[in-house]
Amino acid sequence: RQYLTRALRNGASANEVLDALLMAFPTLGLAKIVWAVDILLDMDIPEFHPENLFAQPAWHTVAPLDELPSGEITYRDCGGRSLFVYRDNETIRVYDSRCPHQVTNIPHLALEGTRLTCPKHHWAFDVTSGECVEVGNRPLREFEHKVENNTLMAFW
């Protein structure tokens, strides 16, 4: 778990992580490889869902702008991924719902005002900036985004 989050944070793809596991097969043996894959599946990380393993990064439709009220934080499910969207007039931020600490999915219920708190280890984030404001030291993962035809799109 601890090495997985570090690998993903440093840019390793799901395919590269799986390749590394398989390369370790002669040393670790089948039982430990199966155990590691079970952990990956239990973590329910979108990158490791079978339909996403060989997918190339692409633009995904998040929502029409009129469904994202200014001054509010909206929780959306999009393309197999949960997102928090902050909109304040022309400022828009699109965040992955997974905590950067151990990739725990942060539910919508963890949002109080503009503060989002991970239920696992209580890392807290300011959704207006994405910065970690309590316990941890890494910001939320923010996705590149654009507005096209009055619709918010995000890239992953």
Locate the predicted segments by residue.
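Short glycine/serine/threonine/alanine-rich loop segments
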Residues: 12, 104, 123
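Short alpha-helical basic/polar micro-motif
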Residues: 5, 97, 116
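Hydrophobic/aromatic pocket-lining and membrane-interface residues
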Residues: 7, 121, 145
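Ligand-binding loop in jelly-roll beta-barrel domains
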Residues: 138
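Short cysteine clusters
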Residues: 99, 118-121
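Hydrophobic alpha-helical segments
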Residues: 1-58
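N-terminal pre-ligand scaffold of iron-sulfur
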Residues: 46-113, 126-127, 131, 141-156
